[in-house]
């Protein structure tokens, strides 16, 4: 949080100075660990047994929110049976974190209510990233730390405008404003005067699967180095090799472009374009270009509009970001 999200990191430090308890889970001795009540340093790749061991402790010591579980949680008995195998002692063997330290963290999270969790790319950009987040959700459900002030599972996105991009609908399952395709279709069709797809598109992992099976033929990567960033490098590279055509649009000749790209489109930096950013707390900040784009580079929106018009697309006659 302190390295990639300095504002949130500062808020966390301020909360600790005002009496909040802090658990840090990171193999490294990061700056935020200096403020931690408990610092767990698991062996890389062992997030799941560690978090499940915390859940085991909360269930075993009956630190869970009984009323919340009874009213809001399903599959309680199967979960209790499942979690029995993840004792702190068994996790100690995998994670290289002492069982007592795991118990201390679990007790602290369960009793210092309200509690919230923050996780970054160390959890999500992982071969078991989805399962890791599910473990965090389980901890929140066990303790009733969802849906109330000071609670929740808070993902810290990788770059400064991922939140804004998602909110604008850069996700196969949602429309602008983070409205689902099914719920928002009637309203958006009436406002846009155009049809909205009945079926959502593929997410990145589904695209990789579709590429490997030959269902996906081409890919356009904008500001994202797929080859270097995706968790399963071997499978990702195999999928990229299976594609017939790859466009890479970025500031730099990244690994995806260098190894697999068919066409490279140079994009302008954030210092060379107008626009907005939305941070993690959904605060919108306007950005003004400090200089003109260098060389042949252009702002992303302009490249997209020019290609769309060349393909005969309608609705791409924008002249500046404000008009968009």
Predicted feature residues:
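Cofactor-pocket helix-loop regions in the catalytic cores of large enzyme subunits
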Residues: 1-161, 175, 184-324
């Amino acid at each position: 949080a302190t390295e990639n999200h300095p504002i949130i990191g500062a808020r966390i430090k301020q909360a600790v100075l005002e009496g909040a308890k802090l658990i840090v889970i990171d193999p490294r001795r990061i700056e935020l660990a200096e403020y931690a009540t408990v610092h767990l340093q698991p062996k890389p790749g062992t997030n799941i047994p560690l978090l499940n061991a915390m859940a085991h402790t909360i269930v075993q010591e009956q630190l869970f929110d009984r009323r919340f579980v009874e009213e809001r949680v399903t599959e309680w008995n199967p979960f209790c049976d499942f979690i029995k195998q993840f004792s702190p002692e068994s996790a100690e063997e995998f994670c290289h974190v002492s069982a007592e330290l795991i118990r201390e963290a679990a007790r602290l999270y369960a009793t210092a209510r309200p509690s919230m969790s923050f996780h970054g790319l160390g959890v999500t950009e992982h071969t078991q990233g989805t399962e890791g987040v599910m473990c965090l959700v389980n901890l929140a459900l066990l303790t009733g730390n969802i849906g109330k002030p000071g609670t929740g599972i808070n993902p810290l996105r990788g770059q400064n405008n991922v939140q804004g991009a998602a909110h604008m609908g850069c996700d196969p399952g949602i429309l602008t404003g983070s409205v689902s395709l099914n719920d928002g279709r009637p309203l958006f069709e009436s406002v846009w005067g155009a049809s909205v797809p009945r079926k959502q598109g593929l997410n990145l992992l589904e695209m990789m699967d579709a590429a490997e099976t030959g269902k996906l033929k081409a890919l356009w990567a904008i500001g994202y180095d797929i080859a270097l960033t995706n968790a399963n490098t071997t499978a990702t590279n195999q999928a990229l090799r299976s594609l017939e055509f790859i466009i890479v649009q970025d500031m730099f000749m990244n690994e995806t472009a260098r190894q697999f790209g068919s066409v490279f489109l140079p994009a302008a930096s954030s210092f060379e374009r107008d626009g907005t950013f939305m941070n993690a707390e959904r605060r919108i900040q306007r950005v003004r270009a400090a200089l003109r784009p260098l060389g042949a580079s252009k702002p992303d929106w302009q490249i997209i509009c020019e290609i769309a018009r060349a393909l005969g697309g309608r609705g791409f006659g924008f002249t500046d970001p404000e008009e968009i």
